[in-house]
Amino acid sequence: MCAGWGLLLLLALPLHARPQVLIVLADHLTLADVTRPDLPGLARMRREGEIALMSPGLAQKPDPVANVYATLGAGDTVRVGDISQGRMADVLRRAGVRMALLGDVGPGQPTSLLLPTPDVMSDTGEVTNPPRLWAATQAAFRSCDLVVVRLGPAQALDEYISVALSEHHGPLFVVVPTPPSLRNGTWNRLTPFLGAGDGHHAHLTSDTTQTLDLIASRDIAPTILKALNVPAPLQMTGAPARPAAPLYPADLSRMDRLTRLNQEAQNPIFWAVGLGAATIVFGSLGLYLAGHMAGLPGKAARYGLRAVSAWPLALLLAPLADPHRVSVYIALFAGLTALLALLPSPPLICALTALVIIGDGLTGTMLISNSALSEYALAGIRFYGIGNEYMGVLIGGALLACALGIPTPRPFLDPASALTPLSRLRPLVGTERGQGRSGGWGLAFWFALAVFVLSFPSFGAKAGGAVTAMATFVIAWRRLRKEPVNWMHLAGSIAAGFVLVFVWALLSHALHLRRTHLETAVGALGQGRFGYIAGVSLRKIGLAARVALHPGTLLGLMAFGLLWLAARRFLWKAIVAHLSRHPRFDAVWGAGLWGCLVAVLFNDSGIVAAILMLQCLALSLLHGLFLEEKDAPARA
């Protein structure tokens, strides 16, 4: 009898056990649009709800908008036609969730990529008539758990949100899939994302970005599924948005502004750096071969080499001035580069850059994430930690720091010299056999600190960075101590790097630190998420191929190839003699070349790290060579 009454009560439960979720889409808006003071509905949502910026990714042709919608619906970074397209809708359908699609959703609209086959679809076309659209929304909720509405201008969005906040009692999300497009069809902005319904006011982040105020477009599908109490499929690479901290609007506006400035400044800065570096390096080489290193031409050539060494550090420091215009941003970068080039040598500049990177890594990589060289937020290649760009600069600078020193008090030193020759310096970091333990411990600590910042989970673990740094520094340690180095030592140091990666993964799991890439991969394998592993692997392979074939990469490789040919033809004896006079520089130079090889082999897009590491080493070699030979006679 009791069992019968229990069954009747169970059957009497309401059909809508899960919350009713409302998603509002509005394209081509920015943070400034949804924070206008004349939009009270959106202002209320910001005050009472959650907010973040969303990375739509770079505009990918032929249809950038469609690709973003496909990503929103897949929970993974995909393009139109990918097998993952519409995965969220498939999951919802299997879970018994009924879906409705309203508003500007007619034929040819990208909303079909988000919800390919909704249970209810109403192309009202009334994107500027919020009251009528809200009536259609209420009607859809009588039979559906999820309603997606696509609206038009910001004013219409605000009117609709004002009504929804008052009358809708479930989760509500405002998603801006794409920012305003530029004339060439690309974009340079992040988009706003707002949430309401949880009753608290906070910043948002996600496990994808692990960055306050930032989520990725592939996080939208997992966020919607979580709101509907539906488990995300194992193949989704995105993660649900989650609250992180109290709201500080200045953080959002600064991230939005720097993202735009970095996108606008990248082309002029990188073309200027590339063309300027080629002109300076090959021009100074011509002056050297012509015997014009004495006097003003030689000083200008050496200053130019130091300027080329300084630009990565200048890009780290320029955003600290909080520029608001791209012209001011570029001027700050140029001024900082010119000032840093006043330092006496490329090794010192590179060592200082490495020190700044280590300090930034220990404090959250704010400088790196805002640098135009990395510019994580919009591209979405990497959202946190140290990427290949500054990994190469860090390893190169850490090596060159071992060739620096303080002048030994000898009477024959020329006090007017701008740089004491390296052979007359007492090393600041490092040791050779018989020099005592203090220098050796200093060298070990310096190398360990660089490896720690590159690999520790809480700083944004980079498995390839740990392997590259470990291999490079072990080789450097042995060479600095005048111990032999062969392929067995290289293989052993690479193995030690992988051991370190596994140790960090175990420690991260035990202490609940930021998840490492290895931990994520092992977890995916344990859950049978082979599609996730395959998808990430294919995406990294594709990214590596695109980076390797990028015109900038090819031009950089061509420049280094030409420089190698010129050095082999005209400078080889002078280089050998220079390295023999400076054994510490010779030791780190050789270790750096090994490190470039390891970077290419064990990092996705490792060619970038290798190029920047090689830049540090080559400029330091040329500067030292030209400085020593400034009074040499002209060469035939």
Spans of features found by a protein language model:
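Core alpha-helical transmembrane segments of integral membrane proteins
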Residues: 254-377, 392-398, 407-409
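Alpha-helical transmembrane segments at the extracellular/periplasmic loop-to-helix junctions
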Residues: 272-279, 382-405, 532, 543-569
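Membrane-interfacial entry segments at the cytosolic side of transmembrane helices
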Residues: 345-349, 438-441, 482-495
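Alpha-helical transmembrane segments
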Residues: 280-293, 338-343, 400-409, 476-478, ...
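Long, compositionally biased intrinsically disordered regions
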Residues: 450, 487-636
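Membrane-interface helix caps and helix-loop-helix hairpins in membrane proteins
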Residues: 319-324, 454-463, 601-608
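Juxtamembrane membrane-water interface segments that cap and precede transmembrane helices
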Residues: 253-267, 368-392, 526-550
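Soluble extramembrane regions of membrane proteins in the secretory/endomembrane system
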Residues: 18-267
